[in-house]
């Protein structure tokens, strides 16, 4: 992994939050991007529940699938009030020109007293979005609107 063991890191950005996520596989980079995003919202080390949500999505390309994946998790947080800390992407596959993801997100009910709110994310953006296979695995760059 080119990140020297890191799952993700935050980068400088003028108005929003930008991060790089790393993984040995495309599935792992999607998991680590989700972890990076949720650590913007809350401290995921304070989450331990096993409430699961299954995520099944289809998109025209891998970059769109990454944005859709993160956007769906953000939607589940906002609507179901579940904070996630563990992500298991079971499969990402390409079929007939479309990409699909099958994944589980684990967490617990959001309680402000248990999960101090760090930063509100309004949306996952396509701004400066990158997803690429590298010599040591995969790397994704994501900007979220705050």
UniProtKB/Swiss-Prot annotation:
Keywords assigned by UniProt, alphabetized: Calcium, Metal-binding, tRNA processing
Record-stated family: Belongs to the archease family.
Full protein name: Protein archease
Domain of life where this protein originates: Archaea
Source organism per UniProt: Methanosarcina mazei (strain ATCC BAA-159 / DSM 3647 / Goe1 / Go1 / JCM 11833 / OCM 88) (Methanosarcina frisia)
Entries under NCBIfam families matching the protein: PRK00407.1 (NF001617)
Role: Activates the tRNA-splicing ligase complex by facilitating the enzymatic turnover of catalytic subunit RtcB. Acts by promoting the guanylylation of RtcB, a key intermediate step in tRNA ligation. Can also alter the NTP specificity of RtcB such that ATP, dGTP or ITP is used efficiently.
GO molecular function, one term: calcium ion binding
Annotated InterPro entries: Archease, Archease_arc, Archease_dom, Archease_dom_sf
